[in-house]
Amino acid sequence: MLKVLEGPSLAERTTLRLGGRALAEVRVTSRDALDDLPGVLQCLGGSPLMLGCGSNILAADGELPVVVVSLDMDDAPTIVGETAEGVVVRVGAATRLPRLLGQLASWGLAGLEGLAGIPGSVGGAVAMNAGSYGCEFGTVLRSVEVFSPDFGLADVPHENIEYAYRHFGLKGCHGWFVVTGADIVLRRGESAAITAAMRANYLKKKSTQPVLARSAGCVFRNPAPGVSAGRLIDQAGLRGKRIGGMAFSEVHANFLVNEGAGRSDEAFELLQLAQEIVKRRHGMDLTLEVKILSWL
């Protein structure tokens, strides 16, 4: 079944708490309903925006020409087999990362401890190839279940998946698609040790990142291996820099935070300022990691 809502507020659906209204939101409550999704999107107009927990989105204010697509399917993590590479776990895209990590720890399955403290959904982690502390989601992917208007609902094996630093794609697919689930491969370990590692990683994040603030996570990609975007912003003198209600965090300069009454234009101004100063001082381009939604 598909549920259509008119004019959802993106400020209410994103962790930055910024943005105007989308044309509509389509909530997918079952896989059987996915076949109807292309027709519904065509009738509604606008570009489809796949949205999980909204933790990597910076949306402009005003009316935006997008239709939000969200999954309302509770696919709990399930062990479905074991191979020479490890234990295979199937998980739905709407599952929140903390829930997945907690289940993996209880099962004694290791491989994603570095993602502790990252908000968001499994679908978002796949789509952005989420990573932290030497761990990337793409490295544990065995296959991805996706829906596309080109080939319907399908399981895409690892060899047909493209992933790199904060990048995910499907070979031969050039249009939009919805990630609905994934099979991941983990290695066996000790539950207590895995839980301890996750807790240590979370506490480290909490002490070095504004994990409880209204933030979209890191806004810029690291421009090169070993080169931190946050350090470049800090060296540019922009740690704690404020414009209106938006600021680069005092805790970690690569985090843009909404201090309560921020506006999208203030956020865009800060991002542009950082790019200009870092380019002038270091000759390096800062590429956005956060997804921008605007009128264009």
UniProtKB/Swiss-Prot annotation:
GO terms under cellular component: cytosol
Leader sequence residues: none
One of the protein's GO biological processes: regulation of cell shape
Cofactor: FAD
PANTHER family linked to this entry: UDP-N-ACETYLENOLPYRUVOYLGLUCOSAMINE REDUCTASE
Family: Belongs to the MurB family.
Protein name, entry field: UDP-N-acetylenolpyruvoylglucosamine reductase
Record organism: Nitratidesulfovibrio vulgaris (strain ATCC 29579 / DSM 644 / CCUG 34227 / NCIMB 8303 / VKM B-1760 / Hildenborough)
